[in-house]
């Protein structure tokens, strides 16, 4: 399996520098990762650096809390689209979900999907804050609202992806919607476990280390 083509090579920390974003892009080119995932201020830089390559530029929407207004999330998408973003990783409004305001959660996602105009939208449900029932409901709403992927985590919450959560999300969304595992995936064994559980996209900042481990293993 071409594990590199499952990876969104990610740098979202608050103090990420221009130099670090350029390094991220260089690594993505070297390993032919599927995409880089950066905060939206760095979309133009990443797009320019990766021009002419197969590496896509993904960015975050409503990140990391998910609690910004729906119209603001939609505007973030529109702005990032103008600047060359290919994919969007949005955070749901977790508080609305836990308040059982499911219609608002659906509309929030649907407006982002609409603004993206057919580009890939990954919906982060932030599993660390949810019960299993809430994870199922969130995954169902995301699928119904037009998400292309349901994603486990921002990496900024109290926990990241687990095999159990990936399996649960996959069981809800079925085979036709993607599942992205992210948060705490720092070695090849964890990446493989997530893929075996049903993930078909991986968000990681330790992607180079993972690829070197896979190379040594002969994968």
Swiss-Prot record:
It catalyses: 2-deoxy-D-ribose 5-phosphate = D-glyceraldehyde 3-phosphate + acetaldehyde. GO terms for cellular component: cytoplasm. It holds the Pfam family DeoC. The active site is at residues 89, 151, 180. Keywords: Cytoplasm, Lyase, Schiff base. Its EC number is 4.1.2.4. Coiled coil: none annotated. Pathway: Carbohydrate degradation; 2-deoxy-D-ribose 1-phosphate degradation; D-glyceraldehyde 3-phosphate and acetaldehyde from 2-deoxy-alpha-D-ribose 1-phosphate: step 2/2. SMART domains: DeoC. It is an enzyme of class 4 (lyase). NCBIfam families: deoC (TIGR00126). PANTHER family: DEOXYRIBOSE-PHOSPHATE ALDOLASE. HAMAP family: DeoC_type1. Catalyzes a reversible aldol reaction between acetaldehyde and D-glyceraldehyde 3-phosphate to generate 2-deoxy-D-ribose 5-phosphate. This is Deoxyribose-phosphate aldolase. It comes from Coprothermobacter proteolyticus (strain ATCC 35245 / DSM 5265 / OCM 4 / BT).
